[in-house]
């Protein structure tokens, strides 16, 4: 039961990001800002599903080899999942940065002010896709090796604490770019927490 809570919270975090993001965008940029942010809300869950699929595909392999005590196979499977997710993150970021005009044009006419807001903001928003990949796969890893507490802590920090704090605080420092960079910063902070756990435990495959 405890292991499944992290999966539930990962899904709930998307809703939290959307609600908090809508509040911040309408506060700073009005209806045009919300319209621009809605584009990110359309494909952010799709990217999450890709990363989540990678993590879930690796979970049976990780769980089995963890159960039989084969630490080397656990490590190699985790690295393969991480490499696949990071590669996808690089591709998603590159596509968003290179084709931001085309992506926005699928949702908003070029004559609307929201178009320019979205074109400028999407590459900033996409800068966190690589860290997003590492975080989601890492949460799945912790679930697979029966480390429910780190998985739950990372999920709560990522999806609720860091996300809300960054969305509320970063725009005060960076104005409009800070709104778009809030989610990437939350992913980076989560990544740093994961690294801290890694160095504390030395080997993730040990309980």
Residue locations for each model-derived region?
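Small-residue-rich hydrophobic transmembrane alpha-helices
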Residues: 36-94, 98-100, 132-154
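Short alpha-helical transmembrane segments in multi-pass integral membrane proteins
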Residues: 1-5, 62-128, 169-207
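Helix-terminus/linker motif at the lipid-water interface of multi-pass membrane proteins
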Residues: 8, 15-42, 46, 64, ...
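Structural signal for membrane-spanning alpha-helices in multi-pass inner-membrane proteins
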Residues: 3, 18, 22, 49-52, ...
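Membrane-helix interface segments
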Residues: 32-33, 148-150, 175-176
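Hydrophobic alpha-helical transmembrane segments in multi-pass membrane proteins
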Residues: 7-19, 23, 52, 84-93, ...
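Short runs within selected transmembrane alpha-helices of multi-pass transporters and secretion channels
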Residues: 52-55, 125-144, 150-162, 166, ...
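Hydrophobic faces of transmembrane alpha-helices in multi-pass small-molecule transporters and flippases
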Residues: 1-20, 46, 50, 122, ...
